Amino acid sequence: MSTHPNALSRRAIAMLKAVAEGRAELRCSCEPDLRVDGLSCCDQNTAHDLAHAGLVRPTRLVAPGQWAPAELTEAGHRALTGFPAAA
């Protein structure tokens, strides 16, 4: 996945916005799952891509398989630059 803003899908942008708004959690594992507002995202492949691209990360270390609040990395903030707040 490219981290260039023009290369992100609308779904990826919406997921990043949810993380930025503090509404998302990551399941800590080698393939981190994402849930928003307590519900699993329908596109976990994109969630994995966002984590592996270094755009999102958990706010704290937890045991493997446990959930932690998600936050944007510096790269994640840069990727959202230029997109309006409303999805």
Regions found by a protein language model. Name each.
Residues 2-45:
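Short amphipathic alpha-helical interface segments
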Residues 7, 37-58, 64-67:
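Short amphipathic alpha-helical interaction segments
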Residues 27, 58-59:
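A local structural micro-motif
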Residues 65-87:
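Short, amphipathic alpha-helical interaction segments positioned at domain boundaries
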Residues 32, 63-64:
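Residue-level "edge-of-site" marker
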